[in-house]
Amino acid sequence: MAPASEAGPAQDPLFSGLILPRSRILDAEALTRSILAEIDAAGPLDPKSARAIAVRQMTEAKAAGNRALSETFEARPREARGLIRAQAALTDGLVTAALRVACERLHPLANPTEAERIAVLAVGGYGRAEMAPHSDVDLLFLTPWKITPWAEMVIESMLYMLWDLRLKVGHSSRTVKDCLRLGREDITIRTALLEHRFLAGHAPLAAELDETLWNDLFRGTGAEFIDAKLEERGQRHKRQGGQRYVLEPNVKEGKGGLRDLQTLYWIGKYLNRVPSPSGLVAAGLLTRDEFETFERAESFLWAVRCHLHYATGRATDQLTFDLQVEVAARMGYADTRGRRGVEVFMQDYFRHATRVGELTRVFLAQLEARHEKREPKIMGLFRRKKRLKPEYSLVNGRIDVLDPKAFLADKLNLLRIFEEALRTGFLIHPGAMRLIAANLHLIDEEMQHDREANRIFLDMLLRHGNPERALRRMNELGVLGAFIPEFERIVAMMQFNVYHHYTVDEHTIQCISTLAQIERHELDEELPIANRILTDGISRRVIYVALLLHDIGKGRPEDHSILGAQIARRVAPRFGLTAEECETVEWLVRYHLLMSDMAQKRDIGDPRTVRDFAKAVRSKKRLDLLTVLTVCDIRGVGPGTWNNWKAQLLRKLYRDTVTALDAGLESLNRENRADEAKRALRELLEEWDPKDLRAELARHYPPYWQALSNATHAVFARMLRGLGETEIRIDLDPDPDRDATRACFALADHPGIFSRLAGALALVGANVVDARTYTTKDGYATAVFWIQDSEGSPYEISRLPRLTSMIDKTLKGEVVAREALKDRDKLKKREAQFRFPTHIAFDNEGSDIYTIIEVDTRDRPGLLYDLTRTLAANNIYIASAVIATYGAQVVDSFYVKDMFGLKLHQKNRQETLEKKLRQAIVEGAERAKQ
């Protein structure tokens, strides 16, 4: 029985615009003839042998076709539409050849009965003729009635051949009635049937299924189908992280991904029986411009997905960090001065994902207008909002424009509608969004500098509660970038590191939202100082504008703080700020990282650090503004970035700086701090013999009393009491204020002690987040390390005894740290592509006593040990280490002296040490790659 061909794939209009002519992909007719001829020439064969001939020839044809497609796509890496159709055409050829071999040679019937008919249909994505290189092949074997033994043998033989071709086949054998029943019961099956496509076999049977589905299943059930698909979409988004700007998006299932576009097409097809997405225009669901946006996004996303499949050799849809670099290179994105190609690629990705969201909104609005889609239940929550201004109307609980012509006659309305939405609490109707997006050209230079327009924008930031929703919608529609052209450059800009969870524009909006939450007393417990500052009063105009502009200089070769300040100098006056306010905004943008850097990269227990910071901020007013900006900036990076550790550092720096500004810089002297610490220790150790207490207070040098808490001084006093010369005492204790475990060590002093301790901690898998070491006048050393587990959390109390034992063994020489660390120095594969140039700086001004060596490089296990071992080998004494981690990047700041107790002033000494530190970093990085 030869398959019917009058409606087969060769004539399907879906296959126009293939990336290669069909003959160069696979000539199905020629392949089938060749297989049949070889089987015939071999004489009588058992089914297995005949099948082997077919599989061998089909394997060769499949390999040749795939090779041709892969090479062509490599040369034309954006032509995804032609590729996915070509992949489907190649699969069609293999499936139809397998059917003919099964029907005509393996299980031939001279006079088939009516029951012995079979139609083979493609369903799902394959039915749409959209296949990535490693997509599944979903087949429906359709029979008139209950499956016959002959049909069962044909299907089994086909499947064996297709499996032997290494195709991932999903299949079902059903009658028309089965399809109808199962389609009613299961929305996933119904969706797959919606996209059925006849391949080969008995064409009338396939036509019967088509008519039955449309007449008896799809008709009259549109609202039910829409609700199910939108519910499915919501659940899918939730599984994928719930937002568009995730670090490693899923190109198929993620928000703004291919599945969202396919959902629009499914709904349009279900309601209007459109044969392809272009039919959505004729159906009135999308405009021509919107459909072009649909096509551009779809082509881009399919290109990404196909490159993912080729790069991994399997069906991969997640754009992990390592694959982002490879796909960007495959698609022709190159590094430029100031930006990596992968960052430009991901910016394009997020912009397309945003447009998919816009299309979804206007599409669903059209359905609501036709009453195809039920009004959202949530709209009932908005019934008691403020009354709208007369130029607006309420449609399905959302603000729409009453008269589009009158609305556009005053271009400032393109801003006013967002203020109205904030003022009333209503959402903006997608129809109004469509009107705005189509008229962005009205936002010209004149409007950008218009005093009233800027007043409206500033009021939006300041007057109506949290402006987050309005800013995000303005950004997605292109209004924000049009009104502030300098902002356009950072829209959807990705920063290729693990630290920043959001694109630059989304980070900015998150920062402003955090500020609004603090103002509304929603974060009082978490952010007491920021809350108090805002309650006492600062310039709201200055802080909101500074937050809006603080990262506006990103994405260029220059330092983004310096460039951002220059941009702020131009932009801030447009908002109507006074000269003094503009100067303050410029200063805040220029130094928006200063407080964070001081708190996280310097020893804030050193009075010199606080004095230098106080000199930089100069006034309590600027300190307050910078503190609030810093808190919002860190919290806006992403979930989990703000923690007790950072909060404590910033609070201490703020309080000490306030003291310095109020009482004078001289108030920050070591003697005062030492006296206070000793007085507190006397109270904590009041049960001690006075002679022992005097000895403890006298045995330490002044720096010991500066940076440690009173409780830690008490711990060390007890550890040092009666300590033998060969004894090592270890105390591990949770420090919830720092989100870490405090590890205290007391032992006899010797060179390289910091390195030994760092190695022992690295060996047990501890991440060091801060450390201090001190020597006593009688030859002992005290060291405190704050450590976290591999998840960035304090160790569970139950693990501390075993951890103590493991550290003790390492320190006693039972384990050699460097050798044992070899197998632990590996980078995670997904993070291996992050590149951070190493910067090493020597600072002799930041501390009165020590040279500060700042090492900014790629983080990895064992790095701190390698650096401290190198310093120890060069006779450098380490007093403390401040570790600041930013995702895969780390800044280790070491407070050091040479063997004579002096700073490292000599240039040649610095250069030699820098060379050796760089060598240690390079050698460690090589080990990590192996």
UniProtKB/Swiss-Prot annotation:
PANTHER family: BIFUNCTIONAL URIDYLYLTRANSFERASE/URIDYLYL-REMOVING ENZYME (PTHR47320), BIFUNCTIONAL URIDYLYLTRANSFERASE_URIDYLYL-REMOVING ENZYME (PTHR47320:SF1)
Any Pfam family: GlnD_UR_UTase
Domain statement: Has four distinct domains: an N-terminal nucleotidyltransferase (NT) domain responsible for UTase activity, a central HD domain that encodes UR activity, and two C-terminal ACT domains that seem to have a role in glutamine sensing.
Entry-linked NCBIfam families: PRK05092.1, UTase_glnD
GO BP term, example: nitrogen fixation
Reactions performed catalytically: [protein-PII]-L-tyrosine + UTP = [protein-PII]-uridylyl-L-tyrosine + diphosphate; [protein-PII]-uridylyl-L-tyrosine + H2O = [protein-PII]-L-tyrosine + UMP + H(+)
The family this protein is said to belong to: Belongs to the GlnD family.
Superkingdom of the source species: Bacteria
Protein name: Bifunctional uridylyltransferase/uridylyl-removing enzyme
Domain HD positions: 504-626
UniProt lineage: Bacteria, Pseudomonadati, Pseudomonadota, Alphaproteobacteria, Rhodobacterales
Organism of provenance: Cereibacter sphaeroides (strain ATCC 17023 / DSM 158 / JCM 6121 / CCUG 31486 / LMG 2827 / NBRC 12203 / NCIMB 8253 / ATH 2.4.1.)
Database matches in CDD domains: ACT_ACR-UUR-like_2 (cd04899), ACT_UUR-like_1 (cd04900), HDc (cd00077), NT_GlnE_GlnD_like (cd05401)
Cofactor(s) listed in the protein's UniProt record: Mg(2+)
Region feature (Uridylyl-removing): 388-741
InterPro entries in the cross-refs: ACT-like_dom_sf, ACT_dom, HD/PDEase_dom, HD_domain, NT_sf, PII_UdlTrfase/GS_AdlTrfase, UTase/UR
Annotated GO MF terms: [protein-PII] uridylyltransferase activity; phosphoric diester hydrolase activity
Regulation of its activity: Uridylyltransferase (UTase) activity is inhibited by glutamine, while glutamine activates uridylyl-removing (UR) activity.
Function recorded in the entry: Modifies, by uridylylation and deuridylylation, the PII regulatory proteins (GlnB and homologs), in response to the nitrogen status of the cell that GlnD senses through the glutamine level. Under low glutamine levels, catalyzes the conversion of the PII proteins and UTP to PII-UMP and PPi, while under higher glutamine levels, GlnD hydrolyzes PII-UMP to PII and UMP (deuridylylation). Thus, controls uridylylation state and activity of the PII proteins, and plays an important role in the regulation of nitrogen fixation and metabolism.
Domain ACT, residue spans: 742-818, 852-927
EC number(s) from the headed UniProt entry: 2.7.7.59, 3.1.4.-
Keywords carried by this UniProt record: Hydrolase, Magnesium, Multifunctional enzyme, Nitrogen fixation, Nucleotidyltransferase, Repeat, Transferase
Stretches the record annotates as Uridylyltransferase: 1-387
